[in-house]
Amino acid sequence: MRIKETLNLGKTAFPMRAGLPNREIDWQKGWADNNLYQQRQKLNEGKPSFVLHDGPPFANGNIHMGHALNKTSKDIIVRYKSMNGFRAPFVPGWDTHGLPIEQALAKKGIKRKEMSLVDYRKLCYDYAMEQVNTQRQDFKRLGISADWDNPYITLTADFEAEEIRVFGEMAKKGYIYKGKKPVYWSPSSESTLAEAEIEYKDIKSPSMYVAFNVVDGKDLLDADTKFIIWTTTPWTIPANLGIAVNPAFDYVQVLADGQKYVVAAERLNKMTDLLGWESVEILKTFKGADMELMTARHPLYDRESLVILGNHVTLETGTGLVHTAPGHGEDDYNAGTKYKLPVLSVVDSKGIMTEDAPGFEGVYYDKANPMVTEALEKNGSLLKLDFFTHSYPHDWRTKKPVIFRATAQWFASIDAFRDQILAQIEKVEFMPEWGKTRLYNMIRDRGDWVISRQRAWGVPLPIFYAEDGTEIITPETIERVAQLFAEHGSNVWFEWDAKDLLPAGFTHPGSPNGEFTKEKDIMDVWFDSGSSHQAVLAARDELTYPADLILEGSDQYRGWFNSSLITSVAVGEVSPYKAVISQGFVLDGNGRKMSKSLGNTILPEKIIKQMGADIVRLWVASVDASSDVKVTMENFQQVSEAYRKIRNTMRFMIANTTDFDPAKDTVDYAELGSVDKFMLVRLNAIIESCKAAYDAYDFATVYKTINMFLTNELSAFYLDFAKDVVYIDGQNDAPRRNMQTVFYAVAVALTKLLTPILPHTAEEIWSYLHEPEEFVQLAEMPEVAHFAGEEDLVATWNAFMGIRDDVLKALETARMDKVIGKSLEAAVTLYPNEANAALLASLDADVKQLLIVSQLTIADQAVEAPAEATQFDGVAVSVAHAEGDVCDRCRMIKTDVGSDDKFPMLCARCAAIVTANYPEAVAEGLEK
């Protein structure tokens, strides 16, 4: 019989190489075939609910790393909650209307103008659903557990119907109105934009100072005086109708190089330098309020501009006198409204100057800038022209600049319930905490929400018009449209005549002939997703309204967090969410946004194909996503290495429990050895820490806690010396069964704790354990156990670990000095102080075995440590080469090798084990 046959060398089919890219697909098929999501929901019936409401990603293209971070984070939370006492359904969603779909069709060569609107919208629908299905497969491949067969999609009939009802409820309460106001307008999209659809980029703009001649100075200013204004948008000068001043500021009339001007007193020195004035004399000082209703000659046209008061005027830039074009600026509009200034807009939907800008009509607004400048220079009104770089709003889809343009639009006003929204924000928990202040300030300061869009693909605004132009929005018309949308989808709005869309027999005093028309604009996509609290949370029996949690990127403070909060408080008088987690963006290694044009993208699909979805998921768990996250391929390599350690450690425990039946072989805690008890106490501390971290949505701490436990306490300590027990002792010997009890408990608990993060790997490990649940996802999270005397036990073993660290340092020194090679070649003598001597004497374990040395002597306190011993705090350590021969079975150097004549190659311990457990070896003898 060979010596190897007497060793309990763990054997397992659990592969060392993960092969995740292929093996994960098999697991996912098994989950689908066994309806695992539905099984988990059924198991959790009757438990307290926890609803994480999925903010809908836009359905366009394959998922990117930001999607992976977001959806995996949600999945980790939902999986944990589902295994920890909650009914936690997860309904995924998609945002499917809007300009990107139209742009995608245009790229495919589909021309909107060459077909009916209904046919075009059907193409948009088909394309959007293709994108939904693409992303659904991407998310499923990532291992996301969800109700994939019943997602919510903003283009479905049931969703659109509920969105109409949200709009109707807001209209009934008086929050919806039509007005002509300057709004963000994208000439490249030919549509209005909400604030959430704006991004800022640096551009170069003109900086221009223009003189307006005083016409009526109200007996304060002479007619030969000039007001000086500053602007960065020369093209809006044709739309100028006023000059705004701050009533509280001091202004001065000055004589500068022979010409009289008016500027703010505090800006005089700056203007003197800027305009190069050499001789400046202050003639008068007065308040801005004194200039109210003065008039000035427009520098280009034969009309007057009115001097008005406005608190928006500041002294940070410019002259303290603000060029006011009510059709092209929000502050201009608000200030001008008080003086009944007309709302004059001088560009059309494409950004082309109109006939309201004589001399510039037919010119693109940006091209009009130099033309306006030239005209002002010719008539002597241009005082100074420079150029500067500044941050300017752009269309987030087309990346082109936007302008302010007054058009007739539909708005949602929040003034009537702004305080109610702010009060609701105070009740919401935000992670990070600064999110509360950010959203609070946004709502406090935001203006009215422009909800109409001049596009084709979206939910129609359910508004009718009478023959006399009266707008018709009544509870009856809203409900009729909602029912029609629920039955036919929103295309019915474009397929049917207005009278057929109205309730049967509907009449209106403004339509004596019974004729009606319908609104052509569609709703802002943020109104779509912003209605999900009614269309999804309130509409589905398995969900709850409000949701317990939402989790999205930090850009959603001005997006979905904002729009859903407004609509929810408007119709339900409550925040749609109880807690908010915001995450940063995924950036490249240099902190740049990932984009195809920069060539710096890392796609989840690539990582999954190369390394597996569990590697992407482990990366998600390893990062602090509360701020922006930089990622490189090296990060995934590092995570892959950490994964390998997890896998190999779990494999070792599986391999060494193949002959362990937990039902028969588990040893009660009270009967375990001290070190085994210590490891179970530590395991329960790990369980407690991980569950607390999961509860706090702190996945990085879960990852670090498990990783440190596996690396420092299991691999580097317990499993390291355990080999001398589980391999060498007899199969049923108590020390071996003690250790197997610990191995198995650790394997089961860690597998459960890892399931939310590594579901594929956890299922693979679980299939090698002897647990009643077929899938670990159907098991419950481990409970935290506490044991009598555990605090003293931990204190004892922590103290021992300090001594062990000292011994390891001494062994390393001996290795470097060529005294020993491996630690098993060492004979160690310890010279402990009184406390450490008592500690070592109290241990019921073989200290030599714990230290993985062949020979150990603990000297009496009376014995003084030799000079060559390494001195530590509380113990001195002396290392020599062990005396004796190497046992061919346990590999220790012993002086009793050959003491049993039957086994001359074995030490006395191994000879006794073989004699007791392998009679054939006794009969036949042993060979190497």
From Swiss-Prot:
PANTHER family: ISOLEUCINE--TRNA LIGASE, MITOCHONDRIAL (PTHR42765:SF1), SOLEUCYL-TRNA SYNTHETASE (PTHR42765). L-isoleucyl-5'-AMP binds at E552. Pfam families: Anticodon_1, tRNA-synt_1, zf-FPG_IleRS. PROSITE patterns: AA_TRNA_LIGASE_I (PS00178). It catalyses: tRNA(Ile) + L-isoleucine + ATP = L-isoleucyl-tRNA(Ile) + AMP + diphosphate. ATP binds at K596. This is Isoleucine--tRNA ligase. One of its GO terms (biological process) is isoleucyl-tRNA aminoacylation. Its EC number is 6.1.1.5. IleRS has two distinct active sites: one for aminoacylation and one for editing. The misactivated valine is translocated from the active site to the editing site, which sterically excludes the correctly activated isoleucine. The single editing site contains two valyl binding pockets, one specific for each substrate (Val-AMP or Val-tRNA(Ile)). SUPFAM superfamilies: Anticodon-binding domain of a subclass of class I aminoacyl-tRNA synthetases (SSF47323), Nucleotidylyl transferase (SSF52374), ValRS/IleRS/LeuRS editing domain (SSF50677). Monomer. It comes from the Bacteria. It comes from Latilactobacillus sakei subsp. sakei (strain 23K). Its cofactor is Zn(2+). The keyword Metal-binding applies. InterPro entries: aa-tRNA-synth_I_CS (IPR001412), aa-tRNA-synth_Ia (IPR002300), Anticodon_Ile_BEm (IPR033708), Ile-tRNA-ligase (IPR002301), Ile-tRNA-ligase_type1 (IPR023585), Ile-tRNA_ligase (IPR050081), M/V/L/I-tRNA-synth_anticd-bd (IPR013155), Rossmann-like_a/b/a_fold (IPR014729). A motif ('KMSKS' region) lies at residues 593-597. Belongs to the class-I aminoacyl-tRNA synthetase family. IleS type 1 subfamily. Catalyzes the attachment of isoleucine to tRNA(Ile). As IleRS can inadvertently accommodate and process structurally similar amino acids such as valine, to avoid such errors it has two additional distinct tRNA(Ile)-dependent editing activities. One activity is designated as 'pretransfer' editing and involves the hydrolysis of activated Val-AMP. The other activity is designated 'posttransfer' editing and involves deacylation of mischarged Val-tRNA(Ile). The keyword Coiled coil does not apply. Zn(2+) binds at C887, C890, C907, C910. GO terms for cellular component: cytosol. GO terms for molecular function: aminoacyl-tRNA deacylase activity; ATP binding; isoleucine-tRNA ligase activity; tRNA binding; zinc ion binding. It is found in: Cytoplasm. Binds 1 zinc ion per subunit. A motif ('HIGH' region) lies at residues 57-67.
